[in-house]
Amino acid sequence: MRTCYTGQVCRDHLGQTVTLYGWVNRRRDHGGVIFIDLRDRTGLAQIVFDPDNAGAFGTAERLRNEFCVRVTGLVRERPQGTTNAELASGEVEVLCRDVEILNPSVTPPFQLDDDNLSETTRLTHRVLDLRRPQMQRNLMLRYRVSIEVRKFLDQLGFIDIETPMLTKSTPEGARDYLVPSRVNAGHFFALPQSPQLFKQMLMVSGFDRYYQITKCFRDEDLRADRQPEFTQIDCETSFLTETEIRAVFESMIRHVFKVVQNVDLPDPFPIMTWTEAMARFGSDKPDMRVNLEFTDVADIMRDVDFKVFASAATTQGSRVVALRVPGGGELSRSEIDAYTQFVGIYGAKGLAYIKVNDVAKGREGLQSPIVKNLHDAALAELVKRTGAQDGDIIFFGADRAKVVNDALGALRVKIGHSEFGKKTGLFSGGWRPLWVVDFPMFEYDEEEGRYTAAHHPFTSPKDGHEDFLETDPSQAFAKAYDMVLNGWEIGGGSVRIHREEVQSKVFRALKIGPDEAREKFGFLLDALQYGAPPHGGIAFGLDRIVTMMTGADSIRDVIAFPKTQRAQDLLTQAPSSVDDKQLRELHIRLRNTEVK
């Protein structure tokens, strides 16, 4: 029986006989004495094989990397000069008395300490990839986060309740993953994008504090921070105000970071409205470590000769902003060209700029191809409003508001995170949480000619905004809130609609007629008529939080068995084709039988 884990062997075990299990990380033959580094999920221990023990030594000669073994031996101090300060077990070694090969290994396709492996190789051989110490640390940290979340919520009286994985497809949000029903021909379940409606049903049922750590599914195009199946810390409460809900879950995140990372997050978190965040940073999830922000200059540019600025300044739905970069005058032409190309990704047609060489000289102290198209009053007000000083550069965005927000918002972050930004103090580092609140309830879809829900259609309007649902949905703001950390949305929630008549108004604003609403959401509308309590909640992305804590490059590095950006599992080769018999049982016929 194992006496302790390999990485836990230390001076406390001196003189003791221990039994260890693990894998051969490395084998070394030093002049008749054989050493192996034995590895398990806790770390490494050095095992010594003396030729005087012929049986153990003979077995050691056959050991190779990744053999699974059991070792029994005496813990002793390492000889002077051979200690390894990088290992917890680095002051001791185990003199092997007995070793058993539990299972040999074929030659692995890569060395576990190879840091230059392609993601395809790593995901195809995920079993071996997960043996790598960094991956094991990532998953152990993920486990610790989950445990601390559960501890915190349990102490506050939250109940862990499971909700269905086979549910009903709804029209809002991303595409559903559909599951055909064998016993109900022509009908389909959907895998849940979130437990949203079920947790609201639980509130109506009287379970006033609910949570679960659960899988959710969205059939959408993937990025580094997205997976088709992801894990959500899902929570809902009754009888709490928006402020009280935020306070509970802010405390939870503060607790988790303190216990798991020994990080003290601010108390309380700053709060910013969506309107302010978009105006200052062009983003509803601003990275507050970057010490740059927008200055609106549309009013200055209405009557200038530069058509790009003047047109945007006088067109509804457009904006003209300036982004002053202190010390940015030192940026080279090639660096500015690279930034110009970068903002093009977000739809910007160019990147105008002005270098401020000498404020005292007025126009003559400004360097830019566009200066000649701006009159003296505009230039003077621009310098004054942005607070520009000698040696600065001012970048401009002038276009539809979405293009400006996306392009200049991304540029702000890119400059802040650059070597230049870090060198000049534009990036402060650390952990900078933020609540963004008061989101618009709706977004207008130009293609469909109707409003869509900005979050989801069950979010309550702010007090006094209910009438806008019928008169002007664009003016309706929601009791919605996102928790943002270092430029990432790690959690989002809202106060929910708990009155049937308000929910029906929202459906009408979304052009969901009574028949469609009854067909798709009849169970919700009915439930709201039975004394549904005021309620609200939040959901956190566990994968994203752990990615940030570990500093991993991709969310796939904190998930045991993730999918690729093509939503494929390279380990099991899923998704795969199925045979005709299975399709017939599901009442499905493929229109194109040629499977790629």
From Swiss-Prot:
Please state the protein's primary subcellular location: cytoplasm
- Give the multimer and partner information: Homodimer.
* Positions of region (Aspartate): 196-199
Give the Gene Ontology MF terms in alphabetical order. Answer: aspartate-tRNA ligase activity; aspartate-tRNA(Asn) ligase activity; ATP binding; nucleic acid binding
- The name under which this protein is listed is Aspartate--tRNA(Asp/Asn) ligase
A single GO BP: aspartyl-tRNA aminoacylation
PANTHER family reported for this sequence: ASPARTATE--TRNA LIGASE, MITOCHONDRIAL, ASPARTYL/LYSYL-TRNA SYNTHETASE
Q: Name one Pfam family in it.
A: GAD
| Reported function | Aspartyl-tRNA synthetase with relaxed tRNA specificity since it is able to aspartylate not only its cognate tRNA(Asp) but also tRNA(Asn). Reaction proceeds in two steps: L-aspartate is first activated by ATP to form Asp-AMP and then transferred to the acceptor end of tRNA(Asp/Asn).
Which organism does this record belong to? Bordetella avium (strain 197N)
